[in-house]
Amino acid sequence: FLDELLNQIIPQVESSLPQPPTWRGIAGYSLAGLFALWSLWQTDAFDRAASASGSLWFPDFVDRASTAPFAGSPQAVYLSLGKKETKTPNRMMRHVLDDTRAMEALLVERGIPTTLELNPGNHFAQTDLRMARGIHWILTH
């Protein structure tokens, strides 16, 4: 999907703009939130990212990210998580808060303005509001 996004979708959208954008952002929820962050290590096409309830529990993602350089120079990253997301029978997913805090620390350590918002509810609570907050945050930072 990243290839299609970079080589088809973005060029088509940007060709309709009156001028090139000054920056690009990427945002996603759950696995798409993981994808948004992963993209920062794969391409320099995105300057800002929002990951709402990102699946940062994904095996070895945070560990690999901590030892790899970014493909570009991210300017800002928004992270959010539901306060009850750790209350799950899935053992891997129980660590999502620890993994998200580790990602926040990694980004801050690398000098990237980053925020982590903890929201009421579980993974499925207020998904539209949380995505809107993440997009608003990257638009204003």
Model segments located where?
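Non-catalytic cap/lid and distal C-terminal segments of serine-dependent acyl enzymes
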Residues: 1-141
